[in-house]
Amino acid sequence: MTLSDAARVTGLQRSAARRFLLTLCDLGYAVQTDRWFALTPRVLELGYAYLGSLRFPEIIEPYLTGLTRELGESSSAAVLDGTDIVYVARSAAPQRLMAISLGIGSRLPAHATSLGQALLAGLSDDEVRARYGRGPLPGFTQATITDPVLLLERLEAVRRDGFALNDQELELGLRSVSVAVPGRGARQAVALNVATNAARVSRDEVMRRILPAIREAAAQCARAVALLG
């Protein structure tokens, strides 16, 4: 929203609304892009107001539900917050995949997840270096990318291919694929993913059956986001 929007909705004078918005930006709860202000995922630490304001669940949940119904696999959506991803919507399949329980507001390291790699690929190499420095990055399995140079190479492949495939880099037995939905205006990018059991679903099946479905869902989601302006 703009400063004028914030003043109108809150009933504050523009000067007071501006002070509050700039304070939120200083604290990391909001970002400013030209005339526009938007909340950041850090607001999740305070509650679910962030999700309501971004309207991500209302936009994304139907597509995640459709993916899970069509594929029989869990699907999720997340945004980038620093070096983490933050889950903003999920549609769980009956079978549990991960050792940890994930819900809205859960955080995972971006470099070790397909969601994170899909979102990091939307940044420039300099922006990625600024977030990670020289490393090494935390490792979770033998497949985790812990070298920032190798991470940049992976992200270049993600940009080229238009998707991120993660093969047991976060947790053994977990294979997932993600596609990003670019941000629009002050609204930041979001990524969709489908997660599978590596012993049950091969890489070939992920590419042949799952990737086309998630690409279509991401395209539909992008069109829905575009309607919001």
Across the structure, where does each feature detected by a protein language model lie?
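N-terminal helix-turn-helix
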Residues: 1-58, 219-227
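Residue-level recognition of specific faces of alpha-helices
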Residues: 23-29, 42, 76, 87, ...
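A short, flexible beta-alpha/helix-coil linker loop
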Residues: 43-46, 137-138, 197-201
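Amphipathic alpha-helical effector-binding/dimerization core
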Residues: 38-135
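Short amphipathic alpha-helical/adjacent loop interface patches that line ligand
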Residues: 10, 21, 43, 64, ...
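A structural signal for short hydrophobic beta-strand segments in well-ordered beta-sheet cores
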Residues: 29-32, 77-78, 181
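Cysteine/selenocysteine-centered motifs that mediate thiol-based redox chemistry or coordinate metal-sulfur cofactors
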Residues: 127, 136-138, 215-229
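Extended hydrophobic
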Residues: 143, 147-220
